[in-house]
Every structure is written in C-alpha cells, then in structure tokens.
Regions:
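Conserved N-terminal catalytic core of the sugar/cofactor nucleotidyltransferase
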Residues: 2-5, 13, 27, 31-107, ...
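Catalytic-core segments of class I nucleotidyltransferases/pyrophosphorylases
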Residues: 99-100, 107, 113-117, 130-133, ...
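Active-site neighborhood of HAD-like aspartate-dependent phosphohydrolases
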Residues: 230-274
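Substrate-recognition element of Asp-dependent hydrolases with the DxDx(T/V) motif
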Residues: 260, 264-300, 311-324
Length: 395
C-alpha cells in the first residue's frame, strides 16, 4: 500500500521551534516525532512505498533521516505551497490507484489494518472526537458512515465535535476534473461528497494534532506506550434529556430537564463521545416526519452549543411501532423491529460505527427498556435515572 506523507506547511504557529525544520522533526524524549510516525508505518508494512511531499526549506531533514535506511522514499520538494489539496492535485501522477494520505502534524498510534479493511477499497477518512473544534474541520455522517456534511474550520457555529484526523484512504480518481489551484484537502472533500461516497471511520484511538504550542506541550506530557480509550455516553432523549409530558413534535415543545443540563455541563472536561439513541414511534403513527425529527435535533444541538459549547455527536432513531389504527400512520414502519428499545440493534450499530470500548461506555436512560439493550451489548455502566440525574441506580 502506497503512503503519501504530506509535510508542506511552514509550521508558523510553532515558531521559532520550526523556523528551519518541519513540525514532525521536533523532538519528544530525544526522538523526533517523525521517528514515532515512521515506526508506526513500519509496524503495518506501510513504509515501503512512501512518498514524502515537503517544501525546499525542509527537504534535507528527510534526506538525512533516510540516509542509512534500506527503503528510500520518493521525496517531492515543491515551491510555491499549494495547500494540502492543491499539492495532491499537482502530484497525482506519482500516486497509485489507491493510497493512504497522512498529514505530518498528526501524532498517531492506530490499527492501520483495521482501517484499510473497513469499507474495502472505498474512500474513507479517520475521524475522531476533537477538543479544539474552533480550528478543526468537523463532519456529520449517517448510520452507514457516509459523510453528509463538512463544517469548515472557518465556520463560527459547528454542530459537530467529530473532526477529520488528517489520515485518509483515497482512490486516485477523486482528483479527476480538479484544476490546479491553492486549496485545502477538506474543501476538496466538501465538494466531492455531493456526488461521491466518502466514508467516516471513527476511531477512539488517540490522535494528537500538535500544530500549536499548547497542543505540542500536551503531547510531550503524554505516555506513548498505551492507546487511550475515550469515554462514550449513550443517552436516551425523552424523559432523560428533555421533558416528555407532551409529545415533542415542534421546537416550541423542547424543554431541557435542568438536571440534564447540569450533568451535561460536567461532561465537557472529559470530551467524551455523546450518542443519543431514541425510540420515536410518532414517525410510524404519522405524528411527525423524519425531516421534522432531524430539524428538532438540529435545534436541540444548537441550543446546547449556545448554552454549554457542547452537543450530541450523533442521534440514532427507531421509527417503528407495530400496533396499527392511527390516523395518518406510515405502513412501512408498522413492524416488529430489532432497533426499538429494549431491542439492541442500534446499540450494536453505534458500537460498530464508532469502534467503542464497552468498558468505557455509560448508558443513561429513565426506563428499564433503556437499560436492557445496554446489558445485551455488554455495556458495564447502565444508569437508570429516577426523575433526576443526581439520584440514579447503576445496573
């Protein structure tokens, strides 16, 4: 498998440390970050077909690194700098039909074999929960992991904390019909998702974007011998998150429970993945449409973002209800399904889509039916809330 390692930036946010060297040649424990990155590639035999794209100021650092190595990469030195996307368009003639693209300012320790085998041969990007969304490109993706929307790092309000990690699996033809110009890779993806399927591979493995002094300092304090598993919360909606006295079919009826807001605020310091799994039988009964549900959830997230600078990362919805006799009911949803709680298929899907560690998941709901699917999927921490999130029972 060919790997394109992109190191074209000047690292201005890390000056003066990067005045004459690329970011990945900064040292941690007397070892360059590139040394760690290269070791990870070797572990999965991804070092043999390596292309390094850099600029003329930094080229010699890579030449020196590989002087005594058996496998020599192709080093492309370019000036002027075209941006992460423009550089790929300019050099696509050197790429194989399928390849992995990695940004040089990402410290990573991931299972590349698992990533490559996910959605075999399809365009995909490793995504993760970011704690610095203000300077990250963030995304929405659907239950099939297809990326549906990208929020540019320049956008002020973002309704997602899931960001692009800087590691891609791409087919060369994604650059077809693109003219050479200065452009970021995220903007190319933004254009392509309109008519091309690009998948998100969510990983709970740790990624560090060390592109600022503050984040570089944090990276230096970390231990690298273990991959950290991130916390995840699966939260029920009605009766746990919002009041369920009246059927919620309009934004006017959304009323957050005070104890939920108190609890949700505490989550911010842990930066966990937050998933909402909710039964919405009103869709099958004809009380509300999928489109209206999505509008409600967008509004709900907007309110959380404004109040707490935090939001739900993804909503999983079961629209089914088998009992018939409702005026305006939708026949295709009048079935016995495997996703309506207490059934567990949406929990399994969330587990699969996000590569979760069940020991690190907290499942929270106000009914026993919310607890059962957690237990079925081996979640260790199932919390039944009794009116308030402060008084709860761990099952």
């Amino acid at each position: 498998m060919q790997v394109i390692f992109q190191s074209g930036g000047l690292g201005t946010r890390l000056y003066p440390e990067t005045l004459n060297k690329p970011k990945c040649f900064l040292k941690i424990n007397n070892k360059t970050i590139f040394n760690y990155q290269y070791s990870e590639l070797k572990k999965y035999n991804l070092h043999k077909k390596l292309i390094i794209i850099t600029n003329k100021k930094h080229e010699q650092h890579f030449i020196n690194f590989f002087k005594k190595k058996h496998n020599k990469p192709k080093i492309i030195s370019e000036d002027p700098i075209w941006g992460s996307g423009g550089s790929m368009i300019k050099n696509k003639k050197f790429f194989q039909k399928k390849f992995i693209l990695i940004y040089s300012d990402i410290f990573f320790k991931i299972n590349f074999k698992k990533f490559i085998n996910f959605k075999k041969d399809k365009n995909k990007i490793i995504c993760h929960k970011s704690n610095h969304v203000f300077d990250s490109d963030t995304i929405f993706f659907d239950k099939n992991n297809r990326i549906t929307k990208i929020f540019s790092k320049k956008e002020k309000i973002k309704l997602s904390n899931i960001s692009l990690s800087g590691i891609y699996f791409l087919n060369k033809n994604i650059f077809n019909k693109l003219r050479l110009k200065k452009i970021d890779m995220a903007n190319i993806i933004k254009k392509k998702i309109k008519n091309k399927v690009i998948y998100s591979y969510y990983s709970s493995e740790e990624f560090f974007d060390f592109g600022t002094k503050k984040r570089l300092l944090k990276l230096k304090k970390e231990k690298f011998n273990k991959i950290k598993k991130k916390l995840a919360f699966i939260i029920d909606r009605d009766g746990t998150m919002i009041d369920e006295k009246n059927y919620v079919n309009s934004i006017r009826k959304i009323k957050f429970l005070k104890d939920f807001l108190f609890f949700f605020k505490q989550l911010k310091k842990f930066n966990p993945l937050i998933i909402c799994i909710t039964n919405q039988s009103g869709i099958s009964k004809g009380f509300i449409t999928y489109k209206q549900i999505h509008k409600l959830h967008k509004f709900l997230n907007l309110k959380l973002q404004k109040k707490l600078k935090l939001n739900i990362d993804v909503f999983y919805i079961c629209p089914h209800f088998p009992e018939k006799g409702f005026k305006g009911e939708v026949k295709k949803y009048k079935i016995k399904c495997s996703c309506r709680k207490p059934q567990s298929s949406l929990f399994k899907l969330a587990n699969k889509n996000y590569n979760l560690n069940t020991a690190k998941i907290y499942n929270i709901g106000n009914n026993i039916s919310d607890m059962v699917p957690g237990i079925k999927t081996n979640i260790k921490n199932n919390i039944l809330v009794n009116r308030t999130l402060k008084n709860n029972i761990i099952i």
